[in-house]
From Swiss-Prot:
Interacts with the connector protein gp15. Interacts with the head-tail joining protein gp17. InterPro entries: Phage_SPP1_head-tail_adaptor (IPR008767), SSP1_head-tail_sf (IPR038666). Keywords: Viral genome ejection through host cell envelope, Viral long flexible tail ejection system, Viral penetration into host cytoplasm, Virion, Virus entry into host cell. It comes from the Viruses. NCBIfam families: gp16_SPP1 (TIGR01563). It is found in: Virion. Belongs to the Caudoviricetes gp7/gp16 head completion protein family. This is Head completion protein gp7. Functions as a stopper that is part of the head-tail connector and that locks the viral DNA in the capsid. Following tail attachment to the entry receptor, seems to open by a diaphragm-like motion, allowing the genome to exit the capsid through the tail tube to the host cell. During assembly, functions as a docking platform which the preassembled tail tapered by the head-tail joining protein gp17 can bind to.
Length: 112
């Protein structure tokens, strides 16, 4: 591992459904502790959709292997240039050859 590579912090968000006092289901995204990661932008695009301009960015996140992370999770960026953004994972996390790190491709911006 290169020192200083994982200088950003992200929180892994998982979708949960619970019940409120009246018994109705309440859906929410809950997160655990912050984990170190490397967050880098890959590409971005703008398009017109329904008369409104929308923008999307593709972001690559590297982190140490985490078994609780899957394609249905989200990542909340807590530090760095993307601080405060919630990233939608667009594919399954891919482990490196030694199984110690994960590469995660994410999108931010308007979702269809």
């Amino acid at each position: 591992m290169e020192p200083g590579r994982f200088r950003n912090r992200v929180k892994i968000l998982t979708f949960t459904t619970s019940r409120d006092p009246s018994g109705q289901p309440v859906e929410s995204w809950t997160g655990g502790n912050p984990v170190p990661a490397e967050v880098k932008g890959i590409s971005g695009r703008e398009q017109l959709s329904g008369g409104a301009e929308t923008a999307q960015a593709t972001i690559r996140v590297w982190m140490r292997f985490r078994s609780e992370l899957n394609a249905s999770s989200r990542l909340e960026v807590l530090s760095g240039p993307y601080k405060g953004q919630v990233l939608n994972i667009i594919g399954p996390p891919v482990a490196n050859a030694t199984g110690t790190r994960l590469e995660i491709l994410c999108k931010t911006g308007a979702e269809k």
